[in-house]
Structure formats: C-alpha cells, structure tokens
Curated annotation (Swiss-Prot):
Family: Belongs to the GST superfamily. Alpha family.
Top-tier EC class: transferase
Protein name (database record): Glutathione S-transferase
Entry function: Glutathione S-transferase that catalyzes the nucleophilic attack of the sulfur atom of glutathione on the electrophilic groups of a wide range of exogenous and endogenous compounds. Involved in the formation of glutathione conjugates of both prostaglandin A2 (PGA2) and prostaglandin J2 (PGJ2). It also catalyzes the isomerization of D5-androstene-3,17-dione (AD) into D4-androstene-3,17-dione and may therefore play an important role in hormone biosynthesis.
C-alpha cells in the first residue's frame, strides 16, 4: 500500500469530484479505483467496506470513509484548509453548504427529462446570477482579502472555484457582472497545486454528458 488516499467511485465527477479537488488543492497525491460494473459496487458492499452501502468511499489513514461531507471535512481539517478557529470554520461551512446547493443544481441538469432540461438549466443559472454569486462578490468586497475566510486558502475557496467553473461550462460569461469573482477565479486558478489540477491529463473529470448516463446506471441501479 502506497499510503496515498484511495478513492472508490465511478470514472465521473458525481459526488467524488469535490474530494478530488480538495486533495489536489492540498497537494496530496491520490489513487483511484473505478467502479466499472455493478459487481464492483456489490463487492465493496459485501466485504463491509461501505458503512451505508454507498459510495463515494475513500481509504485514508487506515479508515474507509463514506459520506461526502464527512470525507471533505476530514481532508480539510487534516490539510489545514478549515480555518484557524471555530468561527472561521462556521463561515467556511456556511459558504460550502451554499455552494453545494448550487453545484447540485448544475450537476443534476443532465439527468432531467428532455422537456425539462432547458427550464431546469435556466433556473440554475438564474440562481447562480441572482442568489449565489452576489453573496460571494459581497463577501470578497467586505472581507477585503484574497480569500473568503481569514487570509489563506480554505476549502471554501476551492469549492467556490470548482462551482464557478461548473457554471461557466453552461454559461461562459456567468461572471460578467462580478469583477471580484473574476479576479478570485484568476488568482485561485494560478495557485500551483490548483493550476496543475486544471491542466489536461490531471485526475479532474470532464462534465457528465447524456451519453455517459447508461454506463453509470448499469453500475448504480
């Protein structure tokens, strides 16, 4: 065993992508064991690796961790991406939970029925422009630092960049009215570990397309 975290999930973004982002931002190398068929998932279930019979699952520090939030909290705490005190952690948690709501909206568009896709995406992009991005523009303005919390990189910054890029895949000019978020995106994208993760050939996964859904359904259903 190499000692690197091992990520068990399908070869897709899904609920593991934020884990990949956070490990990459922390400069932590990790391995991936992809579920390719239903039997791969069944094996993890039957050998007791999945506490609640679900992936994502991450092997780290002798544990087999499940539940995405628990995994992210552990990684953030272990690699000093979770603020310096309880108050900073509370802010980070608030920002991250809000971002998770927006990310979920964007991520779920691909699985909407054909006649609902356009409406669903329009709703998600409207919420990005009018509910979520204005919040983070104001946070950056009021806080007056390069990062959302304190004056160093936290998981909130990592998840904000991940979410911005996901929104821009559907609306490239999504940040047109948000100059501070534009600067934030440019700044954080150039942090060496993140810049490396954004290069072709990294372990970052492409956007889920409709053609990928049957493959995933065969594993998970």
């Amino acid at each position: 065993m190499s000692g690197k975290p091992v990520l068990h999930y399908a070869n897709t973004r899904g609920r593991m992508e934020s884990v990949r982002w956070l490990l990459a931002a922390a400069g932590v190398e990790f391995e991936e064991k992809f579920l390719e068929k239903k039997e791969d998932l069944q094996k993890l279930k039957s050998d007791g690796s999945l506490l609640f019979q679900q992936v994502p699952m991450v092997e780290i520090d002798g544990m087999k961790m499940v539940q995405t939030r628990a995994i992210l909290n552990y990684i953030a705490g272990k690699y000093n991406l979770y603020g310096k005190d309880l108050k900073e952690r509370a802010l980070i948690d608030m920002y991250v939970e809000g971002l998770a709501d927006l990310y979920e909206l964007i991520m779920m568009n691909v699985v909407q029925p054909a006649d609902k896709k356009e409406e669903h995406l329009a709703n998600a992009l409207d919420k990005a422009a009018n509910r979520y991005f204005p919040v983070f523009e104001k946070v950056l303005k009021d806080h007056g630092h390069d990062f959302l919390v304190g004056n160093k990189l936290s998981r909130a910054d990592v998840h904000l960049l991940e979410t911005i890029l996901a929104v821009e895949e559907s609306k490239p000019d999504a940040l047109a009215k948000f100059p501070l978020l534009q600067s934030f995106k440019a700044r954080t994208s150039n942090i060496p570990n993140i810049k490396k993760f954004l290069q072709p050939g990294s372990q970052r996964k492409p956007r889920l397309e409709e053609k990928d859904i049957p493959r995933l359904m065969a594993i998970f259903h």
